[in-house]
Regions:
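ATP-binding N-terminal substructure of ATP-dependent carboxylate-amine bond-forming enzymes
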Residues: 1-114, 118-120, 124, 131, ...
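Active-site nucleotide/adenylate-binding loops and adjacent lid/helix of ATP-dependent enzymes
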Residues: 1-5, 14, 70-77, 116-205, ...
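Generic secondary-structure signature for well-ordered alpha-helical cores
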Residues: 8-13, 134, 190-195, 224, ...
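A short, local hydrophobic-aromatic micro-motif
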Residues: 109, 137-138, 217, 229, ...
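ATP-dependent carboxylate activation and anion-phosphoryl transfer catalytic cores
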Residues: 130-133, 249-281
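Phosphate-binding site of ATP-dependent enzymes
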Residues: 177-258, 278-280
Length: 281
């Protein structure tokens, strides 16, 4: 909504559209929709402290179609000069939507389908990082059919972090501090996906570096008020303190910016991207 407001302030006609819920009107009534943008745009509520119940969201959709795109979404996107992508999660970030728009002739912001797919797959991205000499936490991938609940049988040390392979927003992520917690962490991650990543736990400060067209922006430090940077701390206002530029020695800051630029180049994120970093103690 902030982006939409900024665009409108600069003279653009903008419709804020929910890709799943869509816009329920007859297609023949879509002519002139950008002249009715304020009437059509969805109203954005405060983000809740917990991830939404996906079953409840699907049940609330009027047409109950199995299609990811809500009513009139495709047609409205085709009518726009460009679609600004502001989606989180699997279908919004993993390249599927980008590929669909490519086939439909819809212009959109952000990276293409292939780089989006690679960036969203943590296991694949880590392999590319390793080949390029970009450091990342040590870890393994695990598929549901090869599940192993006994952490002592795996090449891991505790504490570790269990997370869905292609998820986002820290949904399904657990920091496992002892063997008794491991099975529950697997249950949680496999609830969301059939493949997950298990990594060493890095205790330290968290940072984020944006990159626009290959050039890194200043480093931001992210310090949650409580706990780690989970769903609540990411989206609930006041749950984390963000400092920019981060209080770091220049050589450390420069190295983070360099790595962020390398990540964008290796994966092919040639428009804009963001890389997260942990600086251990």
């Amino acid at each position: 909504s902030m982006v939409a407001s900024a665009l409108k302030e600069n003279g653009h006609r903008v419709i804020l559209l929910d890709v799943f819920m869509g816009y329920s009107d007859k297609e023949e009534n879509l002519d002139g929709i950008f002249d009715r943008a304020d009437e059509i745009s969805v109203k954005v509520d405060d983000i809740p402290e917990v991830a939404p119940d996906l079953a409840a969201v699907k049940a609330s959709r009027k047409d109950q179609s199995p299609c990811f795109f809500g009513p009139n979404v495709i047609r409205m996107c085709q009518m726009a000069d460009i679609v600004l992508m502001a989606l989180h999660g699997e279908n919004g970030e993993n390249g599927k939507l980008q590929a669909a728009f490519d086939l439909l002739g819809v212009k959109y912001t952000g990276s293409d389908y292939l780089s989006s797919a690679i960036a969203m797959n943590k296991g694949m991205a880590k392999q590319l990082f390793a080949s390029a000499g970009i450091p990342a936490p040590r870890g393994i991938a695990m598929k549901k059919e090869n599940r192993e609940d006994d952490v002592t049988k795996l090449p891991l040390t505790l504490p570790c972090v269990v997370k869905p392979c292609c998820g986002g927003s820290s949904i399904g992520v657990t920091i496992v501090r002892d063997a008794a917690e491991f099975k529950k962490a697997l249950d949680e991650a496999f609830h969301w996906e059939d493949e997950l990543v298990i990594e060493e736990y890095v205790k330290g400060r968290e940072f984020s570096v944006g990159v626009i067209e290959g050039k890194a922006l200043p480093v931001i430090e992210i310090a949650p008020i409580q706990g780690f940077y989970d769903y609540k701390n990411k989206y609930k206002a006041g749950s984390a303190v963000e400092t920019c530029p981060a209080d770091l020695p220049e050589e450390v800051s420069a190295q983070m910016r360099k790595y962020a630029e390398q990540v964008a180049e290796v994966i092919g994120l040639d428009t804009y991207s963001r890389s997260d970093f942990l600086l251990d103690e």
